């Protein structure tokens, strides 16, 4: 005889199911469950008197020798991913996602996708949201505290460059030369996050870049502060093509070595990741945004201008002066900074993100952006755009799935594809490393509840360790066991070039982390950017007013005075 529950009571016990909507934080965005892989009446729920007990939902006979037995089950999770918004159990084994569906005991339950046994830990995610760990492709390695601050907002992978607070690193995301690349690879070996390093892309000979790729760099970055010249770009792209690594560029704001059209010519149709495609962080003034319409360009922008608020413009000038080693006493330096701060392109940036023309959200950490705000600002922007532009096509009341999937892709799968690491991370899919972030819906986008790295709890909200329970205050994000000892080496990845991987870079310089090669970076186009592949036919920036036109229509939006995910969640 069946037992009936109303939807509200069911959601309280087992989490939302098909057709139910979940509000994301204090935004006006609602995620609607598209498919539920659990079975009503046979949900795998942990706890006293619940299903996951010996001989019931837990197999009494299966050992870990059975490859279907998982190390961890995440039960009843609401998964938000570019692939869909679903309800399912997640099975993790050997640090990877091995199943998304229904976990339990095949002796007592029908149609089980993976087995819960004596070897299995349980994380109860009924009513919670699970996303892939965030990937920030634009990090200045200035402070060694960056990984922890990133984890505080769900960022588990950092790509960028630097050597600490050297002026070159304060300004550019390049780790120059074999010495610095080697020492930085060794420096992050005990840090609980995934890392990749970008070589300095300069020079009129390919050898000066090539030696850095052989030393273990996972990509190349050309930056105007080191010189974004035609020859430097062309030679860097030749090396990128030869070794299958990504190429990123921060173009010439001063238009000294050439204009936007000259830089575009230097690309010669080759795949390029453009940083600061809006322009306030740097790049051809005032028309770098034209790059967002080119098929061979994978465009990203940075979080200090997202979303466009009444205070956004005010902080940019000082940030430019500090980051790029400019002198406020020199008029030319001030003019250089002022040329980059254009409210018209900042306003258009929001809209281009919402249209899917800007494909990736990054931080520009410590050099005009904040590593701990990538995820938060992405959802603030999505919320602002819904309020100003209305639902996306296919969305409806209490169902913003199309917009939600577009925005989650900006900091998960698209950066993974761009830098050649999508086979390993970037989405909640079977076969990928279990770099997962678990959120309470009310805190979504602001503060994670738990962060898993390689299937192990590494960061999370935790109370006073001297108390009788895990819940007493102060409940703050703290390092968990996955952030210590040899566990760090078994659950985190250092990404290098295929050449360095094949030639034993791990053994050569004594790395302990998992070392993996980047791949499949050189034949990408805008069409490979999931749910963010719109390439407008024409983007035009008026050189006098800086107004932005797409296909001859003005693109702009108003700044907002307050944002979601802000003072309700943070004191400062």
UniProtKB/Swiss-Prot annotation:
Its EC number is 3.5.1.5. Ni(2+) 2 binds at residues 221, 250, 276. It catalyses: urea + 2 H2O + H(+) = hydrogencarbonate + 2 NH4(+). InterPro entries: Amidohydro-rel (IPR006680), Metal-dep_hydrolase_composite (IPR011059), Metal_Hydrolase (IPR032466), Urease_alpha_N_dom (IPR011612), Urease_alpha_subunit (IPR050112), Urease_AS (IPR017950), Urease_asu (IPR005848), Urease_asu_c (IPR017951). Binds 2 nickel ions per subunit. Residues 133-572 form the Urease domain. It comes from the Bacteria. Heterotrimer of UreA (gamma), UreB (beta) and UreC (alpha) subunits. Three heterotrimers associate to form the active enzyme. HAMAP family: Urease_alpha. This is Urease subunit alpha. The lineage of its organism: Bacteria, Bacillati, Bacillota, Bacilli, Lactobacillales. The gene is ureC.
């Amino acid at each position: 005889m069946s037992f009936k529950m109303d939807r509200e009571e069911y959601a309280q016990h087992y989490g939302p199911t098909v057709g139910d909507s979940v509000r994301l934080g204090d935004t006006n965005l609602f995620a609607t469950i598209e498919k539920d892989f659990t079975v009503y009446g046979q949900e795998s729920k942990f706890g006293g008197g619940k299903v996951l007990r010996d001989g019931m939902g837990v197999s009494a006979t299966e050992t870990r020798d059975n490859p279907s037995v998982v190390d961890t089950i995440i039960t009843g999770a609401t998964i938000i991913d570019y692939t869909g918004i679903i309800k399912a159990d997640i099975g993790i084994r050997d640090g990877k996602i091995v199943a998304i569906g229904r976990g339990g005991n095949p002796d007592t339950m029908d149609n089980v996708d993976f087995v819960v046994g004596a070897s299995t830990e349980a994380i109860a995610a009924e009513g919670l949201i699970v996303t892939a760990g965030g990937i920030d492709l634009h990090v200045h390695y200035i402070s060694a505290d960056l990984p922890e601050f990133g984890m505080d907002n769900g960022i588990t992978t950092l790509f960028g460059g630097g050597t600490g607070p050297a002026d070159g690193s304060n300004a550019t995301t390049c780790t120059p030369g074999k010495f610095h690349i080697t020492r930085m690879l060794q420096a992050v070996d005990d840090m609980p996050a995934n890392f990749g390093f970008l070589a300095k892309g300069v020079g009129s000979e390919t050898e000066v870049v090539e030696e850095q790729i052989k030393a273990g760099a996972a990509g190349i970055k050309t930056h105007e502060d080191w010189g974004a010249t035609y020859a430097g770009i062309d030679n860097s792209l030749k090396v990128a093509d030869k070794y299958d690594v990504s190429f990123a560029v921060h173009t010439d704001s001063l238009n000294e070595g050439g204009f936007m059209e000259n830089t575009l010519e230097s690309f010669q149709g080759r795949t390029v990741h453009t940083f600061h495609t809006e322009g306030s962080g740097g790049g051809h003034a005032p028309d770098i945004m034209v790059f967002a319409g080119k098929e061979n360009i994978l465009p990203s922008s940075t979080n200090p201008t997202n979303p466009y608020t009444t205070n956004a413009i005010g902080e940019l000038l000082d940030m430019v002066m500090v980051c790029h080693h400019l002198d406020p006493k020199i008029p030319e330096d001030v003019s250089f900074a002022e040329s980059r701060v254009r409210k018209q392109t900042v306003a258009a940036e929001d809209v281009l993100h919402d249209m899917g023309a800007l494909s990736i959200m990054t931080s520009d950490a410590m050099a005009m952006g904040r590593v701990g705000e990538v995820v938060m600002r992405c959802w603030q922007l999505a919320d602002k755009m819904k309020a100003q532009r209305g639902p996306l096509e296919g969305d409806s009341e209490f169902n913003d799935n199309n917009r939600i999937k577009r925005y989650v892709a900006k900091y998960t799968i698209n950066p993974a594809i761009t830098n050649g690491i999508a086979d390993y991370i970037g989405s909640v899919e079977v076969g990928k490393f279990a770099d997962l972030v678990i959120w309470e819906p009310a805190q979504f986008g602001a503060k994670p509840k738990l962060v898993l790295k390689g299937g192990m709890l590494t960061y999370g909200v935790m109370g006073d360790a001297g108390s009788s329970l895990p819940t007493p205050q102060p409940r703050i994000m703290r390092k968990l066991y996955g952030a210590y000892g040899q566990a760090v080496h078994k659950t985190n990845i250092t990404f290098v070039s295929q050449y360095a991987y094949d030639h034993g870079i791990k053994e050569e310089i004594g790395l302990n982390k998992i070392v993996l090669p980047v791949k499949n970076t050189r034949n990408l186009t805008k069409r490979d950017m999931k749910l963010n592949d719109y390439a407008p036919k024409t983007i035009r920036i008026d050189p006098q007013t800086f107004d932005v036109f797409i296909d001859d229509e003005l693109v702009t939006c108003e700044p907002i005075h307050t944002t979601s995910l802000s003072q309700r969640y943070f004191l400062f």
